[in-house]
């Protein structure tokens, strides 16, 4: 069922230094809410600086949707402490508001209550807000308030030198990109293990449905909650953040050029549906353009190949220039058991799994096979903890017990863990021992644990209780890595950077849009 990686693991055991210098970064989204859990109607707090230009504290879709971004880091504990410091600082600046601790929002009465993120009067700031206007008009605003955690991951050059025989990043960009695409294909095939272990959205507040039709056989409890008894991550289901119109784009992950070509096609091809929506209503802009994707970031994907862009460069142009630099994993729900939405066990598991995805053989995949992999994900997302649950293999009809496949995967991961731990530590091996138990006992998964509490208190009740608990905890903890002075300096510098952008504009917004809007 899983590829035979014994040769690759033997190779890894002989090259332990190849894994020294893994780099990671985390992005965590969270809604600002009032004491009773309703979406905050206030603007992005002045005390946090300018969302457009702040290095660490910004906003995602909505003005109330905070996003925290860590710098790239070589050490997991240091990375998580940095993220916690950003949370501590923010918790002290939010007044009576708090950070919603779940992926799924709860007390939102009407879509029109959701204010789009604002970034000031510069052309780039207005462009970002208009992109969000397009998302709202295309998919609805409610879906965009769902929060998650993104894990950015890259292997060191030493790994690629030993594994693929490259000399440096630029001359070896094709080989390194091929290695990361192999990782991505295996992620599509086996990444359902992430929602199985860490999915934490088995339930939603009934207000989230807001009269929308759904074929899902929801059970309800008396506390305003709809749930599926064996679900792991409704955030990743069709109910959450997915995009039906994108499934026939024919995007594949076999090589850089075909991937980029398909992406570029999507941002240049008009969509009948979005042409019908129109570009403007009177003087009001409705979307950046009428193409299948307004910009490349609109592509919904559980994992993305990335390279840091230069000024004025699109994500795909950056990939063509330098190849894949790192991978962005986008399938993590907010961890409700952590005040910062993610923990070290998850980070270490992702390290292990992503390394395994590079090592394991991964035949090329057609866009049809990519769609087949979605069946396994859907099965795990909607009923992953169902007794006797099975997992398919590619597009064939043969299936195996999820428990068997999960344990076989962990036997491999434990060997990777031994290499990562070396003789100094056992932290990766401990993660394996802790998590593999979830295949014998699904009650140990995040989704089972959180659903148990939600059945007693409702998902809204759990969210309120945790939000208050984490608010007090974070407000009272001292900063460990950052200082108040550094955070105040970044706040002021972000405002200054935004101000300079606004002064620098020479074009009117209409001219800027004609140039950059893809119309």
Swiss-Prot record:
The keyword Acetylation does not apply. Its EC number is 6.3.2.2. GO terms for cellular component: cytosol. This is Glutamate--cysteine ligase. GO terms for biological process: glutathione biosynthetic process. Keywords: ATP-binding, Glutathione biosynthesis, Ligase, Nucleotide-binding. The gene is gshA. InterPro entries: Gln_synth/guanido_kin_cat_dom, Glu_cys_ligase, Glut_cys_ligase. GO terms for molecular function: ATP binding; glutamate-cysteine ligase activity; metal ion binding. Pathway: Sulfur metabolism; glutathione biosynthesis; glutathione from L-cysteine and L-glutamate: step 1/2. NCBIfam families: glu_cys_ligase (TIGR01434). Belongs to the glutamate--cysteine ligase type 1 family. Type 1 subfamily. It catalyses: L-cysteine + L-glutamate + ATP = gamma-L-glutamyl-L-cysteine + ADP + phosphate + H(+).
